[in-house]
């Protein structure tokens, strides 16, 4: 058996199970769930793992996460193939939940399908007989950093330490026996491009802001109140006035929403709440911009005579590149779709909690097409299931084969050459230092 013969066997099994892979994606698409609430989705993944006969199936990881593994007689290295369980809020999406407004407007149903598709290809082909190591398949919760107030409540109750699922799993030492990680995101790439390789991305600090004023009759005695909404608006205007100080090369993004603007229209608002991120290309840029944002928020309160509580929360670290691992993925992408359909990765102003993993292990986050429309909008729809769900299944599986072939020669070399920014044990203290500025 040569490595190319094994790859063909893996691809045949994925093609044979094409309808199953697409069916899993479509089922998850019409049953979207928000982060740390993905109970049904987690059960779907667990059932798929059981059907494939995966070992060491674990559930309730960071509340809703689920994992399973396959291995050879040689248990290391351990490669984690990740799919994200959660949706986001997009009430206008055609497949939105009518009650919660949750919708898969970022393609996470494709991640789960391709993670399971990878597992199908490797198990049904008997690939581990010819490979050396372990493959851990992970359905990870809560990548979308949303419902910040709800998650902060979970944190205060001691149910989580971090608002992002992979962060929580890292803090809970799930990743302590993992040597490298990879996943494939879905994207709207146009008709010619099928694959975009892994790139870098922004990180951010999450923020909860609460303005406190004084109630009074909004018509009869507004002068006796302290308008917290006015204070909040001045704070937001102050942030906008800071934008010319944000350097272009730092990719700063600040995008607040008011989650509560008061209680009743005829009462001077006394309780106004804001959620926002402060994003940037580097930790230093994020810290600098965050200080400016806090000054603006405080100034709004001072101007009106209100009070403001600012809670800075661990967001996500800027994503780093792992070129050796990305090149293995690239080779397989070119072999399946041709070099003309594979684009280089770029810097993205969005963020993901896999960024935190890139500081402690080799990890990649490439994308496959198959969708149209703008991500995080009601327009984001899968229009090519083959590219969205089946192609990434093959790419993940073939990359695993390359990494674990020949006594895991390639995988071990990447691990040995990788230099972590800090250790997994040090991770818990990293965000504390960042928030202290």
Pin down the residues of each PLM region.
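Divalent metal-coordination and catalytic microenvironments
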Residues: 28, 81, 108, 137, ...
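Acidic/His- and Gly-rich active-site-bordering loop/insert found
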Residues: 2-105, 109-136, 141-142
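Acidic-glycine-rich active-site phosphate/pyrophosphate-binding loop
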Residues: 81-95, 200-212, 366-375
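Electropositive phosphate-/nucleotide-binding environments in soluble metabolic enzymes
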Residues: 4, 8-11, 15-22, 39, ...
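Histidine/acidic-residue-rich, glycine-tolerant segments that coordinate divalent metal ions
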Residues: 93-103, 109-110, 125-255, 262-267
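Histidine-centered active-site/metal-ligand motif
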Residues: 29-31, 86, 104, 108-111, ...
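Metal-dependent amide/peptide-bond hydrolase catalytic core
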Residues: 233-437
């Amino acid at each position: 058996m040569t490595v190319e013969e094994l790859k063909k066997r893996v691809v045949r099994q994925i093609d044979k199970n094409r309808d199953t892979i697409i069916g899993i994606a479509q089922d998850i698409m019409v049953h979207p769930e928000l982060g740390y609430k993905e109970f049904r989705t987690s059960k779907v993944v667990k059932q798929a793992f059981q059907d494939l006969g995966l070992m060491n199936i674990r559930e309730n990881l960071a509340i809703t996460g689920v994992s399973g593994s396959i291995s050879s007689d040689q248990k290391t290295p351990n490669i984690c193939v990740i799919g994200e369980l959660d949706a986001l809020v997009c009430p206008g999406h055609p497949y939105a939940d009518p009650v919660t407004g949750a919708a898969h407007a970022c393609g996470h149903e494709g991640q789960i399908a391709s993670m399971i598709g990878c597992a199908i290809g490797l198990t049904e082909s008997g690939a581990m007989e010819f490979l050396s190591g372990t493959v851990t398949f992970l359905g990870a919760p809560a990548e979308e950093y949303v419902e910040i107030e709800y998650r902060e409540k979970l944190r205060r109750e001691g149910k989580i330490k971090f608002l992002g699922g992979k962060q929580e799993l890292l803090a809970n030492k799930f990743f302590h026996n993992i040597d490298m990680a990879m996943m494939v995101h879905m994207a709207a790439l146009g008709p010619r491009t099928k694959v975009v390789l892994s790139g870098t991305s922004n990180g951010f600090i999450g923020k909860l802001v609460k303005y406190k004023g004084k109630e009074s009759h909004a018509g009869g005695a507004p002068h006796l109140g302290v308008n917290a909404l006015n204070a909040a608006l001045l704070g937001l205007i102050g942030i906008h006035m800071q934008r010319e100080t944000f350097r272009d090369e730092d990719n700063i993004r600040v995008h607040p929403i008011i989650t509560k603007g008061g209680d009743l229209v005829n009462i001077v608002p006394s309780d106004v709440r804001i959620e926002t991120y402060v994003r940037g290309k580097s930790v230093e840029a994020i810290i600098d911009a965050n200080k400016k944002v806090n000054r603006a928020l405080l100034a709004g309160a001072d101007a009106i005579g209100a009070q403001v509580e600012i809670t800075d929360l661990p967001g996500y670290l800027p994503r780093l590149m792992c070129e050796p691992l990305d090149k293995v993925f690239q080779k397989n992408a070119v072999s399946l779709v041709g070099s003309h359909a594979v684009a280089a990765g770029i810097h993205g102003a969005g963020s993901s909690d896999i960024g935190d993993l890139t500081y402690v292990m080799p990890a990649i986050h490439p994308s496959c097409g198959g969708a149209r429309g703008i991500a995080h909008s009601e327009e984001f729809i899968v229009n090519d299931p083959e590219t969205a769900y089946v192609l990434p299944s093959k790419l993940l599986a073939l990359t695993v084969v390359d990494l674990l072939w020949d006594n895991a020669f390639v995988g071990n070399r990447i691990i040995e050459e990788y230099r972590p920014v800090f250790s997994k044990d040090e991770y818990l203290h990293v965000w504390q230092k960042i928030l202290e500025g």
